[in-house]
C-alpha cells in the first residue's frame, strides 16, 4: 500500500481506502445544579476526568449513541440533549493513534436517579459546574467542550 496522507492505494489492483475520523459524543450532565463527571477507569487517560460518552456505532445518530453510552457508563437515562460544541481529538489506544471528531451536548438528570459507574468508568464525581479545573480532563476536546458549557451557564446567570 502506498500512503498519500489519509488515503491508502494498492498499486496492483487500484483499491483505494480513505482513513476517516471516528465520531464520538459526550454529555455534560447537570443534576441538581451539580455537574456529573466520570473518572476514567482505562487508558487513555486512566484516572483523569471525562464526561460520559464514547464512540458512535454504525447506524446510530450522535444522540442515540450518546444516550446508549450514558446508560452503559452511569446506568441512567437523561433529558433533552442540547448541542454545545465540537472539537477534533487525538485518541491513542493500544499504541494506535485515532483521529476523532468529538461532539458535546448538555443535558440533565433527575436528582433522584442512582448513578452506577460501569463499563470503562471507575467512579463519578459531582462538581460545581463553574469550578472544574480544565487540566483535570483527559482530553483537550473535552476541555474545549467544558469551556463552552461554562460560557453558556454564565450567559444564563449561573454564578
Each PLM stretch: what is its role?
Residues 19-21, 48, 95-101, 116-121:
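A generic structural micro-feature
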Residues 29-30, 37, 107, 126:
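Conserved hydrophobic "DFG−1" position in protein kinase catalytic cores
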Residues 31, 52-58, 104-106, 143-144, ...:
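A short Gly-Trp-Pro
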Residues 85-113:
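Active-site-adjacent beta-strand/loop module that shapes the phosphate/pyrophosphate-binding cleft
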Amino acid at each position: 500500500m502506498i500512503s498519500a496522507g489519509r488515503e491508502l492505494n494498492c498499486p496492483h489492483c487500484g483499491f483505494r481506502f480513505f482513513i476517516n475520523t471516528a465520531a464520538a459524543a459526550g454529555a455534560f450532565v447537570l443534576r441538581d445544579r451539580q455537574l456529573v463527571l466520570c473518572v476514567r477507569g482505562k487508558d487513555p487517560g486512566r484516572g483523569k476526568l471525562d464526561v460520559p460518552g464514547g464512540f458512535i456505532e454504525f447506524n446510530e445518530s450522535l444522540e442515540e449513541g450518546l444516550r446508549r453510552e450514558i446508560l452503559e457508563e452511569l446506568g441512567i437515562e437523561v433529558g433533552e440533549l442540547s448541542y454545545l460544541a465540537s472539537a477534533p481529538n487525538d485518541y491513542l489506544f493500544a499504541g494506535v493513534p485515532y483521529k476523532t471528531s468529538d461532539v458535546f451536548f448538555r443535558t440533565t438528570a433527575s436528582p433522584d436517579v442512582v448513578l452506577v459507574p460501569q463499563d470503562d468508568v471507575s467512579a463519578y464525581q459531582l462538581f460545581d459546574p463553574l469550578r472544574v479545573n480544565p487540566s483535570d480532563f483527559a482530553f483537550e476536546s473535552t476541555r474545549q467542550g467544558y469551556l463552552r458549557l461554562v460560557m453558556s451557564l454564565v450567559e444564563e446567570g449561573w454564578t
